[in-house]
Amino acid sequence: MGKLPTATLKSPWRDIKVYQNHAFIVSEAPDHGLQVFDLTQLRLVKEPQTFVADVRLTDFGNAHNIWINEESGYAYVFGTKLYEGGPLFINVNDPLDPKVEGGYSADSYTHDGQIVIYDGPDLVFKGREILFGSNSDGGEDNQIIIIDVTEKSRPVKISDINYSFSGYAHQGILTE
């Protein structure tokens, strides 16, 4: 097939998610930003080649991780230089025109997260877009944060679960 080079410097860390036939790529390389690559162009490849990203969003520098909520068309980027490393909200409904629409900084660095449209028994949150984040300040303050991110310009903290002195809140995935 070929390769898509890094946007800046080499880094062993990349995270890639796919949405609407596009790969969304972040890296911890300085100033990498978000690369967007249209995967449909791979259908006609006959010889290996070097590809170029279709779009590069440079608003946030580097990032550790990305999650895409396919139901809402939003990407959530974690560990950037914006919002103290908290989640950054990017509208990717048009994959070739991503737009930063907000973020959340109140609870320090978010290492990873999962975002869902809530469909549980609590009617207050039914149909709302909810972020579950694994947060750490790099020391003893580790927590899981639960944020209503339905309104990107006004995220609202619902709750948190504190994991002080217990290691690192690295990642968490819902089971149902």
Which role fits each region the language model picked out?
Residues 1-176:
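Feature marking well-ordered beta-strand scaffolds used for ligand recognition
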